[in-house]
Amino acid sequence: MPESMHASSRFVSRLTRQTLALILAGGRGSRLQKLTEWRAKPAVPFGGKFRIIDFPLSNCVNSGIRQVGVLTQYKADSLIRHIQQGWGFLRGELGEFIDIMPAQQRLQESWYAGTADAVYQNLDIIRQRDPEFIMILAGDHVYKMDYGLMLAYHVERKADLTIGCMEVPLADAKAFGVMQMDGEQRIRKFVEKPSDPPPMPNRPDHAAASMGIYIFNTAFLFEQLIKDADTPGSNHDFGMDIIPQVIQKYRVFAYRFRNAQSGVQAYWRDVGTVDSYWAANMELIGVDPELNLYDQEWPIWTYQAQTPPAKFVFDDDDRRGMAVDSMVSGGCIISGAEVRHSLLFSNVRVNSFSRVLDSVILPDVNIGRHCRISRAVIDKGCNIPPNTVIGENLEDDRKRFYVSPEGIVLVTPDCLGQRLHFHR
């Protein structure tokens, strides 16, 4: 791509102003087990103070895309509340908005039946906005991306559809839509979640996988959605139905997601399992993590709870409040306890003589005295009784909690017999 197109922020801004972003945020994320029993996957807390939905929303705002629809369905109350509380700063008088678009059976007596159907059921609302381009995003991935560069690429290629792609190990590619491109990056073959993924010609141990990021010319998208809705037996899914049908006849291109400075593949995480969720949070504790949450040029926006600074109290030989190699959010109190290599969300209290190691502690958790917790994810609102031991004997843990294939213990209020009636 010409450097001038990448460098011209005015050109990119003009494109982003003509773009409507639709974030698909209705999924449960069942592989996260009880972590999504009472919330949609995009509403799952991440990174000490955020929710997963904040990442695609921040990418939109930082890229200059200020017209956004969030399509919701599964247990969306906490997600909707989060967006209402934290994302009301856009200027409606300037045409900026973040609209929540719940499944409403607008066109037929059924809920969203697939990714394409979710957009199709909102065609009347989209027509009212009259965008030139429509960007479709997954609401459950963690990454930072300037969508303006992808829009510029889409226009330069005179594409009907552009798909964001990344390189993944061949063994992992079965979980993705996999594509094959020619030398011009035009997609010639696309298979959703293949049992035998085709490798990349220059990297036989990797495959080119879809990120679930699509840019459509609006008229083209409408045409394909209406055609798909009238097709008997369709799954009404972009990856399974629409994309394989259009790649031969229309101009469909792949956009490689790379770091603008280094040219290597940029950070992207699915966090779709308990293991991957724990690992992605643990990565943030490192000295120089790949995902830089301290980048002032690309902030991650979110709802800011009004909490006091974290506090560490007691400094006796046998009772010292301390945290080492950890991230500790506002409102936390480490009272004569030890926290090591862990991530604590807001309003967590760790009481005296307890130890937390290699763990992710979600908001509003109280850990009683004399507890030992290691390699665990503790869900929001849990009250851990005194003398509780988690993560040291997985056989015992399996009797009470969920234990992942890699030995991460997930503890939720329901596991503890604590029925919480608040928004998670």
UniProtKB/Swiss-Prot annotation:
One of its GO terms (biological process) is glycogen biosynthetic process. Its EC number is 2.7.7.27. It catalyses: alpha-D-glucose 1-phosphate + ATP + H(+) = ADP-alpha-D-glucose + diphosphate. It comes from the Bacteria. CDD domains: ADP_Glucose_PP, LbH_G1P_AT_C. Alpha-D-glucose 1-phosphate binds at Y112, G177, E192, K193, S210. GO terms for molecular function: ATP binding; glucose-1-phosphate adenylyltransferase activity. The keyword Nucleotide-binding applies. The keyword Nucleotide-binding applies. Pathway: Glycan biosynthesis; glycogen biosynthesis. It holds the Pfam family NTP_transferase. Keywords: ATP-binding, Carbohydrate metabolism, Glycogen biosynthesis, Glycogen metabolism, Nucleotide-binding, Nucleotidyltransferase, Transferase. Gene3D superfamilies: Hexapeptide repeat proteins, Spore Coat Polysaccharide Biosynthesis Protein SpsA, Chain A. Homotetramer. Belongs to the bacterial/plant glucose-1-phosphate adenylyltransferase family. Involved in the biosynthesis of ADP-glucose, a building block required for the elongation reactions to produce glycogen. Catalyzes the reaction between ATP and alpha-D-glucose 1-phosphate (G1P) to produce pyrophosphate and ADP-Glc. This is Glucose-1-phosphate adenylyltransferase. The gene is glgC.
